[in-house]
């Protein structure tokens, strides 16, 4: 295999290539290259298509061709083969060389779409409006862009603060407590109380006694929380009178009524004592008389004659 020759073609090689193209046609480049020592099929094709073909125009580019190239480049970019198809007698290599050598300096940074050739319709570079701070991107892609000396005045360039993003990191051992659920009742609702009364008893009287008992229990509970002592039921002289009034309204023998009352009181006291022992850890419930208070274990109801 002969050594490949790199560099410009000589006039003798150009003449030999013309004769071979006439003989084999402008397609059999592998066969043609075998007759030209040191030249590959690709090199022969490019030399013919870009320089020696009769269809290639060697005259200077006209103003109309320059405008067509500028419009096409704004639309297609560096697709030189596509742009060359829009021109008669111009190859992609010729169009590319003409753009890089001449048109790029003239048209760089301009958008030629919609340009009709007149100076009035030539797009103008967008300038910074008065009073607004300049925007510096640091990227200048065209020769028409400002150089370093144009933006050397750092006093007019706003420095944007850097933004740091922090990713939340879960803390070890963190406990998420449930939100407390508050349940509130309407303050407009009237108080409702349920009480049991014997036949013939006054309902309002029983209601008053129920409210008094509720107030007494609230006072006892607050004293228990404050002093951390065993609570007592207050001894009141009206308790015996209330039972006597209930006994008078009971039909028949009063002894039967007192028996029923005693059983009810025993059951209530037993339940209360059990609850108190449970709250005090199973200890003894009792104590001394203090301010009219007596231990629950010493409360009893005698027979009323």
Swiss-Prot record:
Gene name in the database record: MYB44
Location within or outside the cell: Nucleus
The protein's name: Transcription factor MYB44
Compositionally biased residues, Polar residues: 144-155
Compositionally biased tracts (Low complexity): 183-199, 213-222
One Gene Ontology term, aspect cellular component: nucleus
Region (Disordered), start-end ranges: 116-155, 180-229
SMART domains associated with the record: SANT
